[in-house]
Amino acid sequence: MCVICFVKALVHVFKIYLTANYSYNFRSWPVDFRWDDLHVPGTNNSSHRALTCAAAAAGVWLLHDAALGEDALTRPPRGARSQVQCLLQQIRELPSQLASYALAHSLGRWLVYPGSMFLMTRALLPLLQQGQERLVDRYRGRRAKLVACDGNEIDTMFMDRRQHPGSHGRGLCLVICCEGNAGFYEMGCLSAPLEAGYSVLGWNHPGFGGSTGAPFPQHDANAMDVVVKYALHRLHFSPANVVVYGWSIGGFTATWATMTYPELGALVLDATFDDLVPLALKVMPQSWKGLVVRTVREHFNLNVAEQLCCYPGPVLLLRRTQDDVVSTSGHVPSLPSCQVEGDVEGNRGNELLLRLLEHRYPSVMAREGRTVVIRWLRASNLAQETALYARYHVDDEWCLATLRSYREGRQKDLDHTKTWGPHGPSFPWFVGQGLSARRRRHLALFLARRHLKNLEATHCSPLEPEDFQLPWRL
């Protein structure tokens, strides 16, 4: 055997050995990065508070308390309450609390996160192994074990394109992919940005694939926290070059990341909902309504819309017009002036867009603005969307000029204040005050079209690489 043939054979055997290593127990791997493994000077800056704080995911519980009407910052101390009333209240609520806990830790967890079921993981194991081999062989993926602040081990895969960024420089941008409730990075949503030429970091929810733990919201947030830290401090991407992409239930961790790290570059949400409660009520018996609402609020409070409104950066929503998973019938009010094909009225992405625009541009979305956006949301295909947009004769150039003029005015006013955020003047913007109803409708339609893109696809259809786009920037 010649020397060249021997080297080729050795490389082939080494590849087989590396691939085989992916199939053994991930717990045997050494830890590559911990949530507190930070050696960056100046991290006491408030904008990086989550990078050095053990309670990085405390924001989940703050929103949890707010959802239950118990804002920890405003409620009186317990010492001021009647001890007897508190005791009686706790006794009355004990049966429902026990029922909620039992439901959440049995049937509820399997319904919300079916990918954490052992039988599903075993059934998908051959496909997961093939997916790992593909990412390693074709894209030179690097698998790593991260440890979150709760001790869970998080399985990740990183594909680095910085050495060959492409003609558009996409490889210099990192896309962190947050999978759905039955998705794994080995065969999940990361394929679209990966094939589009971006650097990609995929990770599995706690309890999915090689990740340990259970996929409850707090654990998911802790996992997302260490993934973001890994991207910034070990992979050395600047925050402005990091895009968070969440598909389906991955929108919760995606919005949590951008809420906690507002300096991150952009957010893309694909087939995502605003709140889990309406979707849970759709599939559960009506007689269980009280128990379902309590269980979701206490154990699965995936309040995506609330977290989305806390992020000041560029956002793009991808709505799938044939999506029946994140849809509840008849939620958006019916408007007789627009006929649609298909059922897009109940898509929870509609509510997500409305909440976002109402938070960022309250004057534009008042009355006429909200009505015309609801009408636009009922368009189920590109032809209807374009026809409605043309009917109102929206002047894109005027809308852009108006928004830029308002931003420049805010910039001058905020030059000597601390309200300047990482993406410019903080929201809400009160642009549109004093404009006619017609002009407000134009701005509302313009903003809606820039923040939401329709895709003629079902919930689980793989996203095409050309459909993965970065959000619009003013």
From Swiss-Prot:
Q: Does the UniProt entry include the keyword Hydrolase?
A: yes
The UniProt catalytic activity note for this protein reads: a 1,2-diacyl-sn-glycero-3-phospho-L-serine + H2O = a 2-acyl-sn-glycero-3-phospho-L-serine + a fatty acid + H(+); a 1-acylglycerol + H2O = glycerol + a fatty acid + H(+); 1-(9Z-octadecenoyl)-glycerol + H2O = glycerol + (9Z)-octadecenoate + H(+)
A GO biological process this protein is involved in? monoacylglycerol catabolic process
GO cellular component terms, A-Z: nucleoplasm
Q: What is its EC number?
A: 3.1.1.111
Pfam families xrefs: Abhydrolase_1
For this chain, the family text in UniProt reads: Belongs to the AB hydrolase superfamily. ABHD16 family.
**Lineage, broadest ranks:** Eukaryota, Metazoa, Chordata, Craniata, Vertebrata
Q: Which protein, by its recorded name, is this? A: ABHD16B
What are the AB hydrolase-1 domain coordinates in residue numbering? 175-293
InterPro entries reported in the protein's UniProt record: AB_hydrolase_1, AB_hydrolase_fold
